[in-house]
Amino acid sequence: MAITRIGPNQSINLASNITGTLPTGNGGTGATSFAPGKVLQVQHQEITTTVETSSSSFTDTGFSLAITPASTSSKILCVVNLQSLGKAASTTSALSVRIVRTSTDIGRTTNMMYTLAGSTYQTASIVKLDSPSTTSATTYKVTFKNRESNAVHFNAYTGDTSTFTLYEIGA
C-alpha cells in the first residue's frame, strides 16, 4: 500500500483516491457481512426489590421474559445475575436456582450458595445456551428454592439490581 503525505493546508479526495476496506478506529472489523452467530434481539428484565423464599420447592423469583425466535435454528442465550444472595443469620442454607423454558428445566445450580451459621452474601450468575427449535413466543423464567428449608433471598440491600437477559443468536 502506498503512503501519501499531505501538508497542513492540503487535502485529498478520499472517495476517489482510496480503495479497499478501511480499518475502523473504534474496534470494528470493517467487514460488510458476518457469519452466523449475530445477536438478533435482546429481552431484559431487572428486579430491585428483595425476593425471599423458605420453600424447599422451586418458587418464582419474578423473573419472566418472553422471546419470539426469528428461526427454528436460533439459539437463546440466557444470563441470570443475582445480587446479594443471602440468608437469615444462624441458619444453614443451600440455595438452588434454575432456568425454565415454558415447563422444561434447561439449566440449574444445585448449590449456588451453601453456608453454615452466620450471615453470608454473594453475587452469582448462571449462563445457559438453549435451542428452543420454534418461532413461537417462548417464555423463560427463573425459579429458586432453599434446600435446607430456611429463608434465603437476593437483592438483600437497597440499591441492589438483579437481572435476567435473553439474547437470540442467529444460526
Residue ranges of predicted features:
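Short, intrinsically disordered N-terminal pre-domain segments
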Residues: 1-13, 170
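Alpha-helix capping/hinge segments and adjacent helical runs
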Residues: 27-28
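Terminal beta-strand-rich extracellular "head" domains
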Residues: 57, 69-137, 141-171
